[in-house]
Regions:
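Positively charged, low-complexity nucleic-acid-binding target-recognition regions
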Residues: 243-248
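Core catalytic lobe of class I
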Residues: 1-236, 242
Length: 248
């Protein structure tokens, strides 16, 4: 199910104790469209708030989300650093999630093995102030109330490979096709959904975008709730999910 709405408001309307897993990647607040590494921007969202306001918005959303989660539910947040690592947004998120009462499960490093054209070196060949591009992102995993989950449908091989907190796979390569500037690849929600949920579980993505989490949910036999601000993204996400076949 795709809901076209402002997630900061709509999460308050979700049923209490109804969500088993959250898999999401909120806007990174890196000024997409004016960012020299990404000239594409969101259709309906200005990705350039003052950092304090941005963090307060996210904190408010996850505070409102807490009563909507079942006990033991996991919350997985994919986020990148800003300014070549000088602004550690992931650290701020960990801090406010702990303040809200979420339990830390793990922090996974997603090695994308991708760096933009390195034409800006800072102080080239000098220790003064070199630039440190970050070809990786974080996947922060939290839990509500307790750390135990018993029902899963992942294989032994998947568990062995994915329980190492360093994941290496390529970023999404079809963003131009879909017209969205910041999609994650199906591999990211696939691993999180299989690690932290089971068939029939209800998965929420409050920043649904092109519905990639929903596509994987349908393939894997999970229920899906996606919230997205932009109407065109909602329509394309709906079409993607409808066209997706269930994996037996």
């Amino acid at each position: 199910m795709i809901i076209c709405a402002n997630s900061y408001e709509y999460v308050k309307k979700l049923e209490d104790d109804s969500i088993d897993l959250v898999v999401t990647s909120p806007p990174y607040n890196v000024d997409l469209g004016n960012n020299k590494y990404n000239k594409s921007k969101y259709n309906s969202y200005e990705d350039n708030l003052p950092q304090k306001e941005y963090l307060n918005q996210l904190k408010g959303l996850f505070a409102d989300l807490m009563p909507k989660l079942k006990s033991g539910a996991r919350v997985c947040i994919n986020i990148g650093a800003k300014a070549n690592g000088r602004i550690a947004t992931h650290s701020d998120i960990i801090q406010f999630m702990n303040e809200l009462g979420y339990l830390n499960v793990t922090q996974i490093i997603w090695d994308k093995s991708q760096v933009g054209n390195r034409t800006s070196w800072g102080s080239f060949c000098s220790p003064s102030c070199p630039s440190f591009p970050t070809p990786f992102e974080y996947i922060l995993v939290f839990a509500k109330d307790n750390l135990k989950l018993q029902e899963k449908d992942l294989t032994k091989e998947e568990f062995i490979d994915w329980s190492l907190a360093l994941w290496k796979f390529a970023p999404e390569s079809q963003m131009k096709k879909y017209g969205h500037p910041a999609m994650f690849p199906k591999e990211l929600p696939k691993r999180l959904i299989k690690l932290f949920s089971w068939k029939g579980a209800t998965v929420l993505d409050p920043f649904s975008g092109m519905g990639t989490t929903g596509v994987v949910c349908k393939e894997l036999g999970r229920k899906y709730i996606g919230i997205e601000l932009d109407e065109s993204y909602c329509q394309l996400a709906h079409e993607r999910i409808i066209a997706t076949e269930v994996i037996e």
